[in-house]
Amino acid sequence: MDLGTAEGTRCTDPPAGKPAMAPKRKGGLKLNAICAKLSRQVVVEKRADAGSHTEGSPSQPRDQERSGPESGAARAPRSEEDKRRAVIEKWVNGEYSEEPAPTPVLGRIAREGLELPPEGVYMVQPQGCSDEEDHAEEPSKDGGALEEKDSDGAASKEDSGPSTRQASGEASSLRDYAASTMTEFLGMFGYDDQNTRDELARKISFEKLHAGSTPEAATSSMLPTSEDTLSKRARFSKYEEYIRKLKAGEQLSWPAPSTKTEERVGKEVVGTLPGLRLPSSTAHLETKATILPLPSHSSVQMQNLVARASKYDFFIQKLKTGENLRPQNGSTYKKPSKYDLENVKYLHLFKPGEGSPDMGGAIAFKTGKVGRPSKYDVRGIQKPGPAKVPPTPSLAPAPLASVPSAPSAPGPGPEPPASLSFNTPEYLKSTFSKTDSITTGTVSTVKNGLPTDKPAVTEDVNIYQKYIARFSGSQHCGHIHCAYQYREHYHCLDPECNYQRFTSKQDVIRHYNMHKKRDNSLQHGFMRFSPLDDCSVYYHGCHLNGKSTHYHCMQVGCNKVYTSTSDVMTHENFHKKNTQLINDGFQRFRATEDCGTADCQFYGQKTTHFHCRRPGCTFTFKNKCDIEKHKSYHIKDDAYAKDGFKKFYKYEECKYEGCVYSKATNHFHCIRAGCGFTFTSTSQMTSHKRKHERRHIRSSGALGLPPSLLGAKDTEHEESSNDDLVDFSALSSKNSSLSASPTSQQSSASLAAATAATEAGPSATKPPNSKISGLLPQGLPGSIPLALALSNSGLPTPTPYFPILAGRGSTSLPVGTPSLLGAVSSGSAASATPDTPTLVASGAGDSAPVAAASVPAPPASIMERISASKGLISPMMARLAAAALKPSATFDPGSGQQVTPARFPPAQVKPEPGESTGAPGPHEASQDRSLDLTVKEPSNESNGHAVPANSSLLSSLMNKMSQGNPGLGSLLNIKAEAEGSPAAEPSPFLGKAVKALVQEKLAEPWKVYLRRFGTKDFCDGQCDFLHKAHFHCVVEECGALFSTLDGAIKHANFHFRTEGGAAKGNTEAAFPASAAETKPPMAPSSPPVPPVTTATVSSLEGPAPSPASVPSTPTLLAWKQLASTIPQMPQIPASVPHLPASPLATTSLENAKPQVKPGFLQFQENDPCLATDCKYANKFHFHCLFGNCKYVCKTSGKAESHCLDHINPNNNLVNVRDQFAYYSLQCLCPNQHCEFRMRGHYHCLRTGCYFVTNITTKLPWHIKKHEKAERRAANGFKYFTKREECGRLGCKYNQVNSHFHCIREGCQFSFLLKHQMTSHARKHMRRMLGKNFDRVPPSQGPPGLMDAETDECMDYTGCSPGAMSSESSTMDRSCSSTPVGNESTAAGNTISMPTASGAKKRFWIIEDMSPFGKRRKTASSRKMLDEGMMLEGFRRFDLYEDCKDAACQFSLKVTHYHCTRENCGYKFCGRTHMYKHAQHHDRVDNLVLDDFKRFKASLSCHFADCPFSGTSTHFHCLRCRFRCTDSTKVTAHRKHHGKQDVISAAGFCQFSSSADCAVPDCKYKLKCSHFHCTFPGCRHTVVGMSQMDSHKRKHEKQERGEPAAEGPAPGPPISLDGSLSLGAEPGSLLFLQSAAAGLGLALGDAGDPGPPDAAAPGPREGAAAAAAAAGESSQEDEEEELELPEEEAEDDEDEDDDEDDDDEDDDEDDDDEDLRTDSEESLPEAAAEAAGAGARTPALAALAALGAPGPAPTAASSP
């Protein structure tokens, strides 16, 4: 094969006229060049031949480059010696051995690792000086001579003959020379032994000699193919075995990569020539970069291929095949190339059109396999993830292969962008140069032989050693023929510089600087060429080649060349920005660039704009600020897609055919196969997702349920809400939530009928295969889990329900069974009497199921069954299910019965299943429909498995009581569970004895904390109540004393809450208020927890009052739910005879009468005060009782607050200071930078808190902040100030606004406003507990409940019983405790809640959580929305109600709303939009005020000739005919009117430069804006408003009869400034006024453009009118952009959808921007305009500088 053609081609363009510089640039050998040239005579002789050599000399193309064009002497017959010398010289110069080394050698060299250059050191040489050329992309050499003829013209014909004749002799000459030189070389280094020499001959990289010089083989390209192959192979025959192989004619194998390369090149360049064989695989061993040959001008294809080739092509081959680049020889110093890429860490260099498709271009970042992108070329970026993006065509010209014209030709078309995800790291690192400039590190001057500004080198080393080696007089430099042996001299280490020798330090510095600048410019992505370098190899046709030092940009697709280093830095910055944009997934097209996308809205507009590069996204935009917004759009979109949904925005065309929401409102489609669910609220997303999860679980048999119980699969009742689904989680808040979409609604009446029939039939006849959902009556709320309705009557008794419980029949207890309790330990099934509605909390893993009403539960819980098949159900589902099934109370509206929480240790009561076939009792119907008002208690959870959480004193008391009196425990029907969630229901059959016992024992808990002293007991000589009945607190450091039992109980409650309740880790159960303690009080040192109040329910028989009943209002319920987090002392029931009724200590303490408050002594007015120096003596005040605290205050609020300062909710520290570290001069602060280091100060000890202060009084307040954060966290929220990093990916508020995050697992909601906490918490409650979780039940229960109800209501809400409406509970609902994921983790978003923490929370603090607390201004519209009330200005249309609006796309399809305000016409689904839209109208009203009117794009404004009517949202001025689409112009125009008013008031009229004032001889006419006085008879003209004032005062004086200081002459009046003023014609004033009116108050220069006015004077109709129209329309596009967010905002959130509040706020922010009302906004614009006009009118510029409102933007210059 003829492999040399291109060498000849390359040589057709030698650097003309620069023969002298060639030797310096000439490329030499690597290893053998250390031996130098054979003899200087050879070179001299060859130079002497120069005149006779032609350009095309095949055997010495390098020489002709070095020595200038040579004559044809090469063609003349030469003596044998000359031939031999020529061959040897060529070999020495590396002009042989194009053929690659065989694969075995490749492998060996890689293994031996001797002399390859280190990775990252790329040897590169410029065209015209290198020994090597890379032919990896040459055209095929099939017809060697033919191709050569093409490339070289006539010269090739003449050369081919001699070449042929020379070939055979060259091989033998070379072989002889090689053997002798090797022997001499090894002997020189002391290797005399022949075996050692042979071994070294193998190790020393002689193939590197051929590799380094491979391109020189091109010289033989003119030989016939057969001889060429032989001769060239002989050339690298240092290894005898290979020589033998070659002699025998054996073939050497080619490494694989070459084929790959040739294929690609063959396709791209000359795909029609199939025989292409490329020599490029030699590159795998080369140490210098091979260079694409420069083609002759006759070969267009070659030209295209070569013109912009990268110089580092062969390295790419090495890197792609995973080879290392190693040091090039064994010497101790490196020989980096002139282009040293060692430090160019981000550069891999590729031939254009070549390289892995995953690499970005000719120059690529060194980031694994990811290439540095070209300006527009990110081919398929390979993600780290499993999915690999297929390569996509480049946007840029396939740099040189595909564009026949200049390399700068525009790209052929847009590239389908590679997929980029924002949630993954950036794959393309913008690691541009850290170097400051191109000259960094160079040596500028020489002083005493040393550089003055030495680069920063720590050791005393030769700073030049990177490029230049110094040899002292005692060293041999290794260059055999160097004339300076054993004299001090220097050699350049770069073979491309031919190891140039220096003897002068100045020359060294100069040469070092050259290399340094080259390296620096590579760092910046530029190649530097000096006038001595030939850049045409890489950049063909450069006009600066050989003329001056210049820099070529190396980025693919960029053909910029600069001579100034500052331009280089600027241009680099441009690429940096582009790279950053590409990292972000966008592409920038500047005004001069063609984006190549015909359907781009900016195509052909010559404007800078951006394209999104993500697949399938065609978003284009002009404004850079849209980048972040669009990024977040994709982030959300990816998140939705991950969950199986696709969101379509209002402005998008929905891809689903027939969707009613398309182009109407933001909505979602489920994209799972076969599912057509459509919805508008993200709140429906989770429930629908769970629906699919449940189906999946069911279909995969995760629960192990027998098919008879599973019933129909997805095919039956496919779209009915979720009746056919096993709703284990009980989280579906409303039956309609899954079928709300208009496309999927379907009646479930048939199922309801079936269910009713099933229930009606006797249980015995129920078929064994009846489906589970058949057991669920339609009347049950969707939140009641299936387990509630599983009656054993629906199951065949002999067959156990769960396989894992085989052998245990499903049983229920008869009414008369002695073991009425039927309680079971954790994990076993609970069965109850049919008449006893039982509520069993069930948790994620190991708790009993809930049994609804009278339906006994099967012998194991579904949750337990799920737990048994761990891994098959997602932890999130398990957690949610657990949350939903943990009740705190349940209410039966039929009987008014309140079932309250109870806890019980699992080991206390053993299961006593009875034998019975009990049938449902008479109360089944009503109880089946009892509301499942359950709430999850935030116990400490870990991955869905609950850990015992807060327990109470009552639970421990109950525990002991039941140990002491098992019978009582049985009677109480306690359900045990390990989870620590309350669950119990007292039996209605409690005997009177039990009640008496309960009443007797209820008063006992105070004994834990207080000791009673009677009249005869001696307590303390100093006691104020000595010899009276009183109580002393026995808690350490408290010392409180009480004269009443009521105060004692209250104080005990205080300690119970502050000291943390039960011992940590105990699993204890709460119990009903009928419990009593049977053990003596415990020692004060380890007090148990006083009980949470839970009252017995009234019996089912009727409304007979119960001795201790609990009110059933939702208000109380909400508080009860909250109370599950915060155990309380019991409310002492009012009906317990011997105890005075007392409210809970959770209300404001001022309502209570006892003298001693918790931790405080309260003094009434005129009470003697204990402290002699008390400043509040004889006034109502409080004294702190803690330790030595001297705190005194006047209000209970401060007292309570002070209590918190003493008691830390997280541990039992008494003093707040214990939560801080104190440092002083004695104990120095470890933080060296602490501002208080030399003073006493405190550091907060909480993790992550860096609070420090030296003021003691700040400590309690700081702790309160932490407490507040913990309360928020308990409610599922975390607050971040704008100085804090919130750490949420993609959070748009991060370090921009103070904001909140919901920290419930899986919830990403973030918001700014406190009130959103309430609605969002309620959303989670609804998801858990059902839609009606806080509705008032239809009946308020037995009358006997009311006393307690009012009492507790007062206590919980602090309001009167009359305020018992649902509205009074809004405040409470905000506190409803909803599940927070992984509360046991102290790190991250959740704050750990230690066991005692709930107990320590005081209700008076919790009240502060209300978002409507002290700052609540009015009953906000949001609150009314929460109550389901309609806001003013809106109308609601139900699903089947005709709104009679022909343009309404929702009519008769979905429930929707219309805004009824004039000129609005907004229609939306989802009530929460109402709030946002109402706010929008508020903002609009504040903008338009009474002088403007706003018209939406969808409505006609009815103004004649208005161009915006029905097309754009726009504004009309009601004072003139001005209209605009940009809201910012409204304020500017208003200012304009204000200014005109000022001018008119001063008696002047303004004329713009474009308006003819029609005043004869006015020197300002049509020149600049000016003012004429309108006073009758006055002709004064001014150009500034300051002159008006003085002139106006003159007229005022005249009117008052005062003589003017200077009056005009009686003749033609001359104004003060000497200008001509108006004549005194009587009509002059009228004329001016009418002219001003006709000019629209001179809207030309000074104001905003007015409408075209037919009555205006000519000039106005001409230029000014056109300018006005231009000004108006120019803003139209921008305004549409601005207006979009507003409408998008209104549609972006749907019913009770707080996640979309997130989008909403974003959009509303934009909307606010759209409606900027701050007048300052338009001042800069006005001032700029004024300044612009100042060129014409100094006065106008001065006017802008004045305090008076500046002129509004002119029409002509409006953007």
Curated annotation (Swiss-Prot):
Keyword Nucleotide-binding: no
Chain positions of cross-link Glycyl lysine isopeptide (Lys-Gly) (interchain with G-Cter in SUMO2): K288, K975
Modified positions (Phosphoserine) in chain numbering: S720, S721, S981
GO process terms (BP): positive regulation of DNA-templated transcription; positive regulation of transcription by RNA polymerase II; regulation of neuron differentiation
Residue spans of biased composition, Low complexity class: 397-406, 699-712, 736-764, 1655-1673, 1724-1736
Stretches for region Disordered: 1-26, 46-175, 374-420, 686-723, 736-776, 824-843, 889-949, 1067-1111, 1367-1392, 1589-1620, 1643-1736
Alphabetical keyword list: Developmental protein, DNA-binding, Isopeptide bond, Metal-binding, Nucleus, Phosphoprotein, Repeat, Transcription, Transcription regulation, Ubl conjugation, Zinc, Zinc-finger
Positions with biased composition (Basic residues): 687-698
InterPro entries per UniProt: CASZ1, Znf_C2H2_type
Tissue: Expressed in heart, lung, skeletal muscle, pancreas, testis, small intestine, and stomach, but it is not detectable in the adult brain.
Zinc finger (C2H2-type): 551-575, 610-634, 668-692, 1031-1055, 1300-1324, 1457-1481, 1515-1537, 1571-1595
Name by which UniProt lists this protein: Zinc finger protein castor homolog 1
Species, as recorded: Homo sapiens (Human)
Gene responsible for this protein: CASZ1
